[in-house]
Curated annotation (Swiss-Prot):
The lineage of its organism: Bacteria, Bacillati, Bacillota, Clostridia, Halanaerobiales. This is Putative regulatory protein Hore_09800. Belongs to the RemA family. Transmembrane segments: none annotated. HAMAP family: RemA.
Amino acid sequence: MSVNLINIGFGNIVAGNRVIAVVSPESAPIKRIIQEARERGMLIDATYGRRTRAVIITDSDHVILSAIQPETVSHRLSGEDGNR
């Protein structure tokens, strides 16, 4: 079983086969998911202090914040972008 590694910005990499969803952080339900993950200790902030542009939800219930656009993460997951 090969692991598909995806660059989510600033040298941070996630296992693509563990990603369930890549969403925008603006909606109230996503903000609630982020807050609940923070309270459970399951939030990973990979923004390096920059604005959160994508929220990545994994099958292990981890929530990862990224400073790159959801569309960019999606392209990298689908293999259309060589920036892995």
